[in-house]
């Protein structure tokens, strides 16, 4: 049976996952709630500077955007509790405004009639986080869940493969992350993060991230063993994780690469990738895998200390796994 989905917040992630959902037979987007008018929503969906023109026929009226003749209801309601999820028989709401990251806030979608809620960002309280390749199998029917962050979706599968095979002692992660909509194009005020207010096009900007710590929440065996930071860089999309890790079971870099390659073909298929090509970031634009290991970019100091590199499209890969989580929560 098709899962009826409503999207609250039609920003970068909302639009990318909408495009991806059009390729899936198990998910149907029924409604979008955003403060933008249907005309502007249709325009932003059709034309995208990063992912190109959307190859569907798009029109609109005062209450809908229309994709290949199919109406998708559009509303502009600020309070999630007042949304019409019940009237539209919505099974799962994707909460992608970036604003409602606490249980009490996300629960308003349940009060409005949705059966389940998937939050597209790391939760700010006890909303459980689920990452494909890490802990999807532990889902027990919770009504409100988080898909964590794009960086956690890259780091967690890689960390699990290393920990399962070699036993992680401790590690530090750096993500070299593409610019996002929260940054300033030129220098501007950012009271909570002074460096974050500097011009995104002109600077490499050090930043904090909870992505590595969040791995310990989806993989409890790694709790307290990983932490990390970010550099925001002037590219529009695609990011890369640098995981420097110490592990128990001695192994050469080649042996580690072999285990990662095997995992990408078996238990991590559809999640992790493996490449020995001379790749750069734009080669992964539009990639739905969330962690593509770059064998030629990493190195080892000895048989217990290694640097591992994995690429990810921080928009497409993450959005793909949000839809996988929607599919998961609809079944229990």
Curated annotation (Swiss-Prot):
Instruction: Decide whether keyword Nucleotide-binding is in the record.
Output: yes
Its pathway, per UniProt, is: Carbohydrate degradation; glycolysis; pyruvate from D-glyceraldehyde 3-phosphate: step 1/5
Main localisation: cytoplasm
Q: Main EC class of this protein? A: oxidoreductase
- List the Gene Ontology MF annotations in alphabetical order: glyceraldehyde-3-phosphate dehydrogenase (NAD+) (phosphorylating) activity; NAD binding; NADP binding
* UniProt-listed PROSITE patterns: GAPDH (PS00071)
Keyword check for Zinc:
no
Q: Which SUPFAM superfamilies has this protein been placed in?
A: Glyceraldehyde-3-phosphate dehydrogenase-like, C-terminal domain, NAD(P)-binding Rossmann-fold domains
- Tell me the domain of life: Bacteria
UniProt-listed SMART domains: Gp_dh_N
Task: State the protein's purpose.
Answer: Catalyzes the oxidative phosphorylation of glyceraldehyde 3-phosphate (G3P) to 1,3-bisphosphoglycerate (BPG) using the cofactor NAD. The first reaction step involves the formation of a hemiacetal intermediate between G3P and a cysteine residue, and this hemiacetal intermediate is then oxidized to a thioester, with concomitant reduction of NAD to NADH. The reduced NADH is then exchanged with the second NAD, and the thioester is attacked by a nucleophilic inorganic phosphate to produce BPG.
- Subunit and partners: Homotetramer.
PANTHER family documented for this protein: GLYCERALDEHYDE 3-PHOSPHATE DEHYDROGENASE, GLYCERALDEHYDE-3-PHOSPHATE DEHYDROGENASE-RELATED
Give the protein name, as stated in the record: Glyceraldehyde-3-phosphate dehydrogenase
User: Which gene is annotated as encoding this protein in its UniProt record?
Assistant: gapA
